[in-house]
Swiss-Prot record:
InterPro entries named in the record: DUF1450 (IPR009910), UPF0741 (IPR020880)
The protein's name: UPF0741 protein Aflv_2757
HAMAP family, sorted: UPF0741
Pfam family, one: DUF1450
Superkingdom: Bacteria
Species assigned in the record: Anoxybacillus flavithermus (strain DSM 21510 / WK1)
Amino acid sequence: MQNEFRVCDDCQATNLKTLLPRLKKLDPNATIEIGCQSYCGPGRKKVFAFVNNRPVSAMTEDELIEKIAAKLKK
């Protein structure tokens, strides 16, 4: 099954310029969907991504990438 990442292009805590290349590095074959994820409350304060329809968030992008990598290994 192919992994899917969904990220918001409008949330204040998310920097797509740095996050997208890192997600592609984690899984080059994953589908990446960019757009509003209706996760605005947490998205103001935390970096987040939906990984296979499950939200993953962290205070920093580095922490987020670590959490996503761990989730993909399961």
